[in-house]
Amino acid sequence: MDEGTRTVLRKFEHIEHCLKRNVEAHATNGFEDVHFVHMSLPEIDKDEIDLSVKFLGRKFDYPIMITGMTGGTRKGEVAWKINRTLAQAAEELNIPLGVGSQRAMIEKPETWESYYVRDVAPNVFLVGNLGAPQFGRNAKRKYGVKEVLYAIEKIDADAIAIHMNPLQESVQPEGDTTFSGVLEALAEITSSIDYPVIAKETGAGVSKEVAIKLESIGVSAIDISGVGGTSWSGVEYYRAKDELGKRLALRFWDWGIKTAISLAEVRFSTNLPIIASGGMRDGITMAKALAMGASLVGIALPVLKPAAKGDVEGVIKVIKGYVEEIKNAMFLVGARNVEELRKVPIVFTGFVREWLEQRIDLQEFVKKRAKLRFEFWNVGFYSYPYTSSSTHLF
């Protein structure tokens, strides 16, 4: 079996396990330690609340992104159906959409249609996806700017996400652990293409140290994807070929940084737009993430099942439920929009507070998340952040 065929088969297995098994983290995402202060007199009307946000030069109706999940099967097969269903929902809701890793498309070009959605979603903000290990200096087939542009332009995407998944690769039977030189390769990409580059984790969170490096090389945004949602070590547990592999994946099932903690670290240490994903399962949690300084919240697993059935309305129903919950939380803290939400009081307790007090200046973080502003202007498709005298928030 050639490498491309193995990659396609792996995509089938990942989808199957996510649909049929419990692959979520056993640990929480940490937002139970983040608290709003209820306002008995919110002094706003609920009907006037505006959930629209700006991100990478585009305005969206809601601060929610469907993050990349799958791709790599042939036309008419499951990944093709999932991406087209999600795209139609994202188009109707005017929210951004990511596709899964396009490595399969590069190795098996005939699978490209499983990522292509422009015929059903001509206006959706679409984010392509490639994996960090393929950019390592010791990768079996090293990717570069050429492969990035191919991944973007073949599906007419608006941006590219480079997913950082060392945890998954380290426990995967056929994992690629060639991560040396990735930062240098990403620096070349950000300086060479006219598209936004999003650095994306895959369920283990981004630390302040990594975030600072990513900002220094010019990435446009970070998807923190922390602990608390889908565990890719958990997925690989079910794919393991022997007891040693199962034991390794089980041991690292909950490895990483909780989403709430990662969000605070990255927000405190950088001025980059942040997608907060990792266990986003209700609108109150999403509102907390936005209040902490996230530009968008990301979801994946909650909409996978209706998407696999081709149920566009089912996907929309899930997301609209989250929207109503976010809106209600904003009403109860007196926030008319996401900018005002970042100024409401929040209180940290428990493990999250203990962690953050050792890692950042927590009081300074609370002040910074309310003051941070971004202005974007475009050169081609690339968005440059500007922070000294901005007039709008994401």
Curated annotation (Swiss-Prot):
FMN binds at T67, G68, M69, T70, S101, N129, K200, S225, T230, G279, M280, R281, A300, L301. One of its GO terms (cellular component) is cytoplasm. Substrate binds at R10, K11, S101, Q102, R103, Q168. GO terms for biological process: isoprenoid biosynthetic process. Coiled coil: none annotated. It is found in: Cytoplasm. Its cofactor is FMN; NADPH; Mg(2+). Keywords: Cytoplasm, Flavoprotein, FMN, Isomerase, Isoprene biosynthesis, Magnesium, Metal-binding, NADP. Signal peptide: none annotated. It catalyses: isopentenyl diphosphate = dimethylallyl diphosphate. Its main location: cytoplasm. Homooctamer. Dimer of tetramers. NCBIfam families: IPP_isom_2. Involved in the biosynthesis of isoprenoids. Catalyzes the 1,3-allylic rearrangement of the homoallylic substrate isopentenyl (IPP) to its allylic isomer, dimethylallyl diphosphate (DMAPP). This is Isopentenyl-diphosphate delta-isomerase. It comes from Pyrococcus furiosus (strain ATCC 43587 / DSM 3638 / JCM 8422 / Vc1).
